[in-house]
Amino acid sequence: MKVAIDIRRVTEFGVGTYTRNVVRALSRLDHTNQYFLIGSPQKATEIGPLPPSFQTIALLDDGTTARGYIEFRAILKRLQCDLVHIPHLFWMPRTLPCPYVMTVHDLLEHMYRTRTRSSLRRSLHLHLTRRVLKGAGRILAVSKFTKSEIENVFGIPGSRIEVVYNAIDERFLHGHATDADRQVLAERYLIKYPFLLYAGSISPPKNLVRIIEAFSALKAELEKEGKFPDLKLIIIGDELSKHPDLRRTVIRSGVQNDVRFLGFIPIEMLRVFYDAAKIFVFPSLYEGFGLPPLEAMAHGTPVVTSTTSSLPEVVGNAAVLVNPENVFEIMRALLHLLLDQPVRDQMKKRCYEQAKKFSWDVSARRILEVYAEVAAAPRTPARLQAGETTRRVET
């Protein structure tokens, strides 16, 4: 097969992590098929060294312009690709010269971000996204939760959706932080105190306002107990400047001396933060998969996360689950994990076991099977009506 993969978002958080690790796993497992990585050659270096069967095809457009769409389509036609994998959800229908496999990470665009749009724009967005999903040769959902969302919101039959789980970036599997790593933490970031950790994107669904409020309540409880007087909350994530409400929450909660915003941290150091944290706190309101809790678990760090969306599916019995809308429930979970050492020891063991259940190689093997099934499938009338009508002449 000739397989194209759209890598134009390979440097982004989430989609980029997925794209890099899928390509790496495919390069380890597949020595038969030919792959064309369509996107920026400079960004492709983020993936690392690849065998000769993986070739980067330059396309600098970010995927949002008509010109970029035309160039993308022309590349697929010129290379005579058997299929293309687009590793993210998109909404503008595309008449491509070969079948496409699409990965859906979540439906956040339809659950939260559409609230600021008019009802007409929301309806159009929903309608066009449904057409795109119906036109896909196969849809890859990163969790059972995301699969059920696609079925319920768009009416796509479950038989056309394959659950293929995410996994941890291999750089988080290099063992515990060394004394030298912790020295860097102390010298470069001036961290010489116990801390709770949040790592991820900075956006309303991540529930950071309640994390800060729960931390403030926790400090008050710890003061009564005479425990952890120097405990801090560290928040790692970009785009803080777009969310001034977080700074206001810190000041209103009276913890301005105990909350630190560190912005972007490279993976090589992020693993040290995971390893050194007392607890990883992630009471997100909505996750299609939710990798950060799993990354923390790989280091044996206890996790407090949500009872909602995909998170119970991902963390299993290896985390403390809370109602993400209840600040005091979050606080009580944090307090319990901080003060009960036997529970911490039990959670650490479960964390290691849970993290091992997810593997990029296992996921890539299933993706390869899907590629073969889609490439071999006949173009049915139903598929043509769903968005492939213009392919009849080209195929």
Annotate the PLM regions.
Residues 1-395:
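Carbohydrate transferase catalytic cores enriched for Leloir-type hexosyltransferases
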